[in-house]
Design a protein with these regions (language model features):
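Non-catalytic C-terminal accessory region of glycerolipid acyltransferases
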Residues: 1-9, 100-259
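Membrane-anchoring hydrophobic helices of lipid-metabolizing enzymes
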Residues: 1-58, 63-96, 164-165, 236-259
Protein backbone atom coordinates (compact mmCIF):
# COMPACT_ATOMS: atom_id res chain seq x y z
CA UNK A 1 0.00 0.00 0.00
CA UNK A 2 1.27 3.47 -0.89
CA UNK A 3 2.12 5.31 2.33
CA UNK A 4 1.05 8.92 1.89
CA UNK A 5 2.64 9.99 5.16
CA UNK A 6 6.03 8.99 3.80
CA UNK A 7 5.63 11.53 1.01
CA UNK A 8 6.89 14.82 2.41
CA UNK A 9 5.47 16.73 -0.52
CA UNK A 10 1.93 15.62 0.31
CA UNK A 11 2.48 16.23 4.01
CA UNK A 12 3.66 19.77 3.28
CA UNK A 13 0.70 20.41 1.00
CA UNK A 14 -1.75 19.47 3.74
CA UNK A 15 -0.01 21.72 6.26
CA UNK A 16 0.00 24.67 3.86
CA UNK A 17 -3.72 24.28 3.26
CA UNK A 18 -4.40 24.03 6.98
CA UNK A 19 -2.53 27.27 7.58
CA UNK A 20 -4.16 29.17 4.72
CA UNK A 21 -7.70 28.22 5.77
CA UNK A 22 -7.26 28.25 9.55
CA UNK A 23 -9.44 31.37 9.86
CA UNK A 24 -12.42 29.20 8.86
CA UNK A 25 -12.02 27.27 12.14
CA UNK A 26 -12.92 24.00 10.37
CA UNK A 27 -14.16 21.18 12.59
CA UNK A 28 -14.48 17.45 11.90
CA UNK A 29 -17.09 15.69 14.00
CA UNK A 30 -17.05 11.92 14.62
CA UNK A 31 -13.83 11.07 12.74
CA UNK A 32 -13.77 7.79 14.68
CA UNK A 33 -16.50 6.54 12.34
CA UNK A 34 -14.02 6.29 9.46
CA UNK A 35 -12.90 2.64 9.37
CA UNK A 36 -9.38 1.42 8.71
CA UNK A 37 -8.54 -0.02 5.32
CA UNK A 38 -10.15 0.80 2.03
CA UNK A 39 -13.01 3.27 2.39
CA UNK A 40 -14.80 5.61 0.01
CA UNK A 41 -15.69 9.00 1.48
CA UNK A 42 -18.45 10.97 -0.26
CA UNK A 43 -19.06 14.67 0.32
CA UNK A 44 -21.09 17.70 -0.71
CA UNK A 45 -19.32 20.28 -2.85
CA UNK A 46 -19.09 24.07 -2.55
CA UNK A 47 -17.93 26.74 -4.98
CA UNK A 48 -14.42 26.06 -6.36
CA UNK A 49 -14.22 22.96 -4.19
CA UNK A 50 -13.02 25.10 -1.31
CA UNK A 51 -14.63 22.65 1.11
CA UNK A 52 -12.20 19.89 0.08
CA UNK A 53 -9.16 22.11 0.65
CA UNK A 54 -10.24 22.61 4.27
CA UNK A 55 -11.20 18.94 4.72
CA UNK A 56 -7.92 17.37 3.62
CA UNK A 57 -5.86 18.75 6.54
CA UNK A 58 -8.59 17.77 9.01
CA UNK A 59 -8.60 14.18 7.80
CA UNK A 60 -4.81 14.04 7.98
CA UNK A 61 -4.82 15.44 11.51
CA UNK A 62 -7.51 13.10 12.86
CA UNK A 63 -6.69 9.87 11.03
CA UNK A 64 -3.02 10.23 10.04
CA UNK A 65 -4.16 9.35 6.53
CA UNK A 66 -4.56 11.58 3.50
CA UNK A 67 -7.44 10.77 1.18
CA UNK A 68 -6.86 10.22 -2.50
CA UNK A 69 -9.26 12.79 -3.87
CA UNK A 70 -10.97 11.80 -7.13
CA UNK A 71 -11.44 15.16 -8.85
CA UNK A 72 -13.39 16.20 -11.95
CA UNK A 73 -11.09 16.20 -14.99
CA UNK A 74 -12.35 19.69 -15.82
CA UNK A 75 -10.67 21.08 -12.69
CA UNK A 76 -7.26 19.84 -13.77
CA UNK A 77 -7.50 22.17 -16.77
CA UNK A 78 -7.66 25.27 -14.56
CA UNK A 79 -4.20 26.89 -14.56
CA UNK A 80 -2.43 26.39 -11.25
CA UNK A 81 -5.26 24.44 -9.65
CA UNK A 82 -3.97 21.06 -10.79
CA UNK A 83 -0.75 21.69 -8.86
CA UNK A 84 -2.72 22.28 -5.66
CA UNK A 85 -4.65 19.04 -6.17
CA UNK A 86 -1.50 17.01 -6.82
CA UNK A 87 0.16 18.50 -3.73
CA UNK A 88 -2.38 16.78 -1.49
CA UNK A 89 -2.64 13.49 -3.37
CA UNK A 90 -5.69 14.22 -5.51
CA UNK A 91 -5.95 12.58 -8.92
CA UNK A 92 -8.23 12.83 -11.94
CA UNK A 93 -11.21 10.66 -11.17
CA UNK A 94 -11.19 7.34 -13.05
CA UNK A 95 -13.16 4.28 -11.87
CA UNK A 96 -10.42 1.72 -12.49
CA UNK A 97 -7.81 3.75 -10.64
CA UNK A 98 -10.21 4.36 -7.75
CA UNK A 99 -10.97 0.65 -7.42
CA UNK A 100 -7.26 -0.21 -7.42
CA UNK A 101 -6.53 2.33 -4.67
CA UNK A 102 -9.42 1.12 -2.52
CA UNK A 103 -8.37 -2.51 -2.88
CA UNK A 104 -4.91 -1.44 -1.70
CA UNK A 105 -6.47 -0.08 1.49
CA UNK A 106 -6.46 3.61 0.60
CA UNK A 107 -8.98 6.19 1.79
CA UNK A 108 -10.53 7.84 -1.27
CA UNK A 109 -12.69 10.96 -1.37
CA UNK A 110 -15.19 11.77 -4.11
CA UNK A 111 -17.89 14.37 -4.62
CA UNK A 112 -20.66 12.65 -6.62
CA UNK A 113 -22.27 15.99 -7.51
CA UNK A 114 -19.04 17.13 -9.14
CA UNK A 115 -18.69 20.58 -10.64
CA UNK A 116 -22.45 20.89 -11.18
CA UNK A 117 -22.95 20.79 -7.42
CA UNK A 118 -20.22 23.32 -6.76
CA UNK A 119 -21.73 25.77 -9.28
CA UNK A 120 -25.16 25.99 -7.65
CA UNK A 121 -27.08 29.16 -6.78
CA UNK A 122 -28.03 30.33 -3.24
CA UNK A 123 -31.52 28.85 -3.71
CA UNK A 124 -29.87 25.44 -4.12
CA UNK A 125 -27.63 25.60 -1.05
CA UNK A 126 -26.99 22.26 0.66
CA UNK A 127 -28.79 20.22 -1.99
CA UNK A 128 -27.02 17.12 -3.29
CA UNK A 129 -26.93 16.97 -7.09
CA UNK A 130 -26.58 13.20 -7.17
CA UNK A 131 -29.33 12.25 -9.61
CA UNK A 132 -27.94 9.75 -12.12
CA UNK A 133 -24.53 9.93 -10.40
CA UNK A 134 -23.93 6.19 -10.15
CA UNK A 135 -20.15 6.09 -10.48
CA UNK A 136 -19.32 6.11 -6.78
CA UNK A 137 -21.77 3.28 -6.11
CA UNK A 138 -20.23 1.14 -8.87
CA UNK A 139 -16.74 1.78 -7.50
CA UNK A 140 -17.73 0.82 -3.95
CA UNK A 141 -19.45 -2.34 -5.20
CA UNK A 142 -16.48 -3.36 -7.33
CA UNK A 143 -13.98 -2.74 -4.54
CA UNK A 144 -16.35 -4.08 -1.84
CA UNK A 145 -15.55 -1.22 0.56
CA UNK A 146 -17.84 0.85 2.81
CA UNK A 147 -19.05 4.30 1.84
CA UNK A 148 -18.85 7.02 4.50
CA UNK A 149 -20.71 10.32 3.93
CA UNK A 150 -18.92 13.45 5.15
CA UNK A 151 -21.40 16.31 4.96
CA UNK A 152 -20.20 19.90 5.35
CA UNK A 153 -22.23 22.79 6.77
CA UNK A 154 -21.19 26.39 6.21
CA UNK A 155 -19.49 25.71 2.89
CA UNK A 156 -22.35 27.05 0.74
CA UNK A 157 -22.06 30.38 2.57
CA UNK A 158 -18.36 30.74 1.72
CA UNK A 159 -18.98 33.27 -1.06
CA UNK A 160 -21.59 35.89 -1.92
CA UNK A 161 -23.33 34.98 -5.16
CA UNK A 162 -23.40 37.73 -7.81
CA UNK A 163 -24.35 36.30 -11.22
CA UNK A 164 -23.70 33.38 -13.58
CA UNK A 165 -21.49 33.34 -16.67
CA UNK A 166 -20.40 30.76 -19.26
CA UNK A 167 -17.65 32.82 -20.85
CA UNK A 168 -15.56 32.64 -17.68
CA UNK A 169 -15.64 28.85 -17.74
CA UNK A 170 -14.45 28.77 -21.36
CA UNK A 171 -11.69 31.26 -20.59
CA UNK A 172 -10.42 29.49 -17.47
CA UNK A 173 -10.71 25.89 -18.66
CA UNK A 174 -10.07 26.46 -22.35
CA UNK A 175 -13.31 24.75 -23.34
CA UNK A 176 -14.93 25.40 -26.68
CA UNK A 177 -18.32 24.82 -25.10
CA UNK A 178 -18.97 25.42 -21.41
CA UNK A 179 -20.55 22.56 -19.46
CA UNK A 180 -21.76 24.86 -16.68
CA UNK A 181 -22.71 28.44 -15.95
CA UNK A 182 -20.02 29.68 -13.58
CA UNK A 183 -21.38 31.51 -10.50
CA UNK A 184 -19.41 34.73 -10.20
CA UNK A 185 -19.14 35.32 -6.47
CA UNK A 186 -17.49 37.56 -3.91
CA UNK A 187 -15.19 36.42 -1.12
CA UNK A 188 -11.88 37.58 0.35
CA UNK A 189 -10.30 37.69 -3.07
CA UNK A 190 -10.25 34.02 -4.09
CA UNK A 191 -10.45 32.95 -0.43
CA UNK A 192 -13.81 32.24 1.20
CA UNK A 193 -15.64 34.49 3.63
CA UNK A 194 -14.87 33.76 7.32
CA UNK A 195 -17.77 31.40 8.02
CA UNK A 196 -17.01 28.29 10.05
CA UNK A 197 -16.93 24.98 8.17
CA UNK A 198 -18.29 22.00 10.11
CA UNK A 199 -17.89 18.48 8.69
CA UNK A 200 -20.08 15.65 9.98
CA UNK A 201 -18.87 12.08 9.45
CA UNK A 202 -21.69 9.57 9.04
CA UNK A 203 -21.85 5.89 9.82
CA UNK A 204 -20.23 3.55 7.26
CA UNK A 205 -22.66 2.14 4.70
CA UNK A 206 -21.67 -1.35 3.61
CA UNK A 207 -22.33 -2.41 0.02
CA UNK A 208 -24.13 -5.70 -0.61
CA UNK A 209 -21.71 -8.59 -0.96
CA UNK A 210 -20.49 -9.45 -4.42
CA UNK A 211 -18.34 -7.35 -6.74
CA UNK A 212 -20.40 -8.69 -9.66
CA UNK A 213 -23.29 -6.48 -8.49
CA UNK A 214 -21.47 -3.50 -10.01
CA UNK A 215 -22.67 -4.86 -13.36
CA UNK A 216 -26.30 -5.05 -12.20
CA UNK A 217 -28.02 -1.69 -12.91
CA UNK A 218 -30.75 -2.30 -10.34
CA UNK A 219 -28.25 -3.16 -7.61
CA UNK A 220 -26.18 -0.08 -8.43
CA UNK A 221 -29.22 2.22 -8.39
CA UNK A 222 -30.46 0.73 -5.12
CA UNK A 223 -27.12 1.21 -3.38
CA UNK A 224 -26.67 4.70 -4.81
CA UNK A 225 -30.14 5.65 -3.59
CA UNK A 226 -29.44 4.26 -0.13
CA UNK A 227 -26.29 6.36 0.22
CA UNK A 228 -27.89 9.46 -1.34
CA UNK A 229 -30.85 9.43 1.06
CA UNK A 230 -28.62 8.89 4.07
CA UNK A 231 -26.25 11.65 2.99
CA UNK A 232 -28.99 14.23 2.31
CA UNK A 233 -30.62 13.53 5.66
CA UNK A 234 -27.24 13.84 7.36
CA UNK A 235 -26.55 17.11 5.52
CA UNK A 236 -29.93 18.57 6.51
CA UNK A 237 -29.19 17.80 10.16
CA UNK A 238 -25.65 19.19 9.90
CA UNK A 239 -27.00 22.47 8.51
CA UNK A 240 -29.64 22.70 11.26
CA UNK A 241 -26.94 22.30 13.89
CA UNK A 242 -24.68 24.80 12.13
CA UNK A 243 -27.45 27.41 11.99
CA UNK A 244 -28.27 26.93 15.67
CA UNK A 245 -24.73 26.95 17.05
CA UNK A 246 -23.38 30.09 18.78
CA UNK A 247 -21.57 32.46 16.42
CA UNK A 248 -18.47 34.47 17.15
CA UNK A 249 -18.16 37.90 15.53
CA UNK A 250 -16.10 36.58 12.62
CA UNK A 251 -18.59 33.86 11.74
CA UNK A 252 -21.50 36.29 12.07
CA UNK A 253 -19.76 38.73 9.72
CA UNK A 254 -19.09 36.02 7.15
CA UNK A 255 -22.69 34.82 7.16
CA UNK A 256 -24.00 38.37 6.79
CA UNK A 257 -21.71 39.07 3.84
CA UNK A 258 -22.70 35.77 2.18
CA UNK A 259 -26.36 36.77 2.25
Amino acid sequence: MHNLLADRHLDRGAKLLAGALSYLRPELRHPERIPQGGVLLVGNHALMGIDSFALYPLLWRHTQRLPRGLADRFLFKVPGLHKVFHSVGAIEGHPDQAVDLLRQGEMCLVYPGGSAESFKSPAQRYQLFWKDRLGFAKVALRAQVPVVPIMAAGVDHAYRYLFRDKLLVRHVAGQGKARYDFPVSLGLGILPLPVQFTYHVGEPIQPPQGAHLADDPRAVEAFQGLVWRAAQGQLDEAVRQWQAQPRDWLDALGRKLAG
